[in-house]
Amino acid sequence: MESGFNMGNSPSKTGNAEELVKTTLFERERNGITYRIPALVYLRHCHTFLAFAEKRTSPSDCDAKILVMRRGTLKEDGTVQWASSEEMTTASFPNYRTMSPCPVFEKNSRTLFLFFICVRGNTTERKQCITGKNRTRLCCVSSSDDGHTWSPATDLTESVIGETIHKWATFAVGPGHGVQLENGRLIIPAYTYYIKYRCCSYPIPFTVLPRALSIYSEDFGQTWHMGKMLGKKSCECEMAEIIDHEGRSHLYCNARNSGYRCEALSENSGVYFDKPHVARELVEQRCGCQGSVIGFPAPEFVPNDDAESKACGTSLLSPDTQTWLLFMHPTNKSSRRDMGLYLNRSPLHSSGWDKPRIVHRGPSGYSDLAYNGDKDQFSCLMECGKESELEQISFMSFTLNDVMQTGNAFCL
């Protein structure tokens, strides 16, 4: 584990993929301590990144203990200065393990909410699905000073889920970032293992399947509600707002599945999602893997690399949307390898995904994306390594021009 301060990478100024490098924020320790499940948020008003992860005593989900955070300050030269890791002691409950960080920033009050789940003891997800006995709680902490201090943890299970919890074998949020829509609504992506049928109080085998949904707030985080589940198998998910050419909002959901990702759109800000379908351009491994998606303003043009042609650039104005999407996920069909970035210039069409740009050759796992609108830059956290994706969680920044390069990879 790194201590003190260190300087992170800056995005390529030339679009040369070879220039991009990774900065290790969390690294597996010799005593077995492992860091997993990254989440990233960029606070634009104070030029600060907050990077979250689970701290575990082993790679196993059962050995998750507490959430950790590192603060990164974006400098004028584009580098990021990272403070040392700190444990989030208020984001916990006695006899529960803390998992699945999901931050969202409320711009009006400048309040940062960090959602997570707490799971009783060492109860596994599998055991909850077999017995139908939920041992998971929906929890949240908040900060009004950009993550320097945090409120005590609040258990929102009863107020948000209520009696429906008896139909949920287990559930989780994200993992990864939430989003605030243009209308002010806060969105936390979530999923549940829904119990459709029981026999003698136990779920009927093979009928407990994951379903994605949103948890949302219409009053800037004062109260929270849950939306309706997707009508198709869908697990860990992230969501992004798409603004079409007429200024209408669409909430896009991208969820873990088997074989291919699951996509859906909501026309009512996350209350429910219509017509979930598989995205055949976005491949999944057999058991799937978490992925990250983010929306950003569609550019009118991207400057060409050579100085003489920068004034004109290349026209890229989308005919049907003001928003593009960027998606991050391992690109290998058979194993968690070769982390890639997929660009979608027509996100209201399911076939709009470009072929991926590889950002890490080798073992890759969970990830999270953030966008800096001031500099039109992207940043990400990703699980990666040489022999295993559990070796480290790394940070990297890049530009849209980098994503659109036709070379092989950003970094090897």
What are the functions of these language-model segments?
Residues E2-L412:
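Asp-box/BNR beta-propeller blade signature and adjacent active/binding-site loops
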